[in-house]
Amino acid sequence: ARYLSCQNPNDEDACGKCPNCVKFDKLAHPDLHFVFPVVKKKSSKETVSDDYLPEWRELLKETPYFNLPMWLQAMGTENQQALIYVKESDEIIRKLSLKSSQGGYKIMIIWMPEKMNTECSNKLLKLLEEPPAQTLFLLNAMYIAAKKMMK
């Protein structure tokens, strides 16, 4: 994802030094969006990934390799079920309907898409099949779930 936004990429990787690379390293590039399972907050009727974005960034900075129990602990919601709710699909559609702030790709990283509820996945199907120009979806499914889907 960083490579696509790099202002000075080489043949193998992003430069790591341009303003876009620095923003990607901080997980704060305006055209980089994350979607991941969340636990509904009691204070909010509809919870979306952005509500937990600081915790997400912190965990990713600590370790790029983690699982759902580690994520639940980072959110402070152990022993609760995390899902990607239908409101998230509205947020994805809204974010991707905007122009790229840097003039390049809009990148949507969806971690554990298998945790989407049915309503959410149905609303996103058309968008995934025919994304807007210069839009990239990266879906990162858990290995076990992906293996089951292949059978």
Regions flagged by a language model, labelled:
Residues A1-E119:
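Clamp-loader machinery-focused feature within the broader ASCE/P-loop NTPase space
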Residues L27-D31, G103-Y105, P131-T135, A145, ...:
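Short glycine-/polar-rich loops that comprise or flank the Walker A/P-loop
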Residues S97, N122-L136:
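Conserved catalytic/switch belt of AAA+ P-loop NTPases
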Residues I107-W111, L124, T135-M142:
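Structural recognition of the conserved hydrophobic beta-strand(s) that form the central parallel beta-sheet
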Residues E119-L128, I144-K151:
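Short regulatory helix/loop adjacent to the ATP-binding pocket of P-loop NTPases
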